[in-house]
Amino acid sequence: MSNPYGFPQYVIDRVMAKRGRLNVFDRFEPRRTALLVIDMQNFYVGEIASVVGIIPNINRIAADVRAKGGRVIWVGMSAGKGGQSDWPIYHDHFFTPEKGANHRDQLSPGHPGHAFHKGLDVKSGDDIVYKNRFSPFIAGASNIDDVLKQSGIDSLIVTGT
């Protein structure tokens, strides 16, 4: 069987035995699909070549999703504001005091680290969602569930860091 994804053959065999076909869907509905671009903020991306190197592909996928009628949602981390942490147990116990403050402050609105990388093609019609935990899907971490439901989105393409 052709394997353009580089999966080991045993994985393909297990998938085929489970559902009888490799792909879950034969096609997708663009208007019910969103591209989620996760944590492509200056704090995480910086000028790390391997991360900056994926930006052209992210922009290309975003343009294709938009052109077909899908949505693009940029998801970023907001760790606090005004010196106050949105997740104090994380900042106070998983870091040294200095590193916890650095993470909190650089991922606060208004700090250059909080901004999405300048190479990303964020459009005015795109959605921007901020989270205060690792995943935007943790209850109370973001409004991503509302954004997806209000837009009729039930299929996701996920990329980023």
Q: How would you describe each model-predicted region?
A:
Residues 1-124:
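Active-site acidic carboxylates
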Residues 76-78, 132, 161:
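Short, well-ordered beta-to-alpha junction loops that form the rim of enzyme active sites
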Residues 109-157:
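Internal catalytic-core helix/loop-beta-alpha segment
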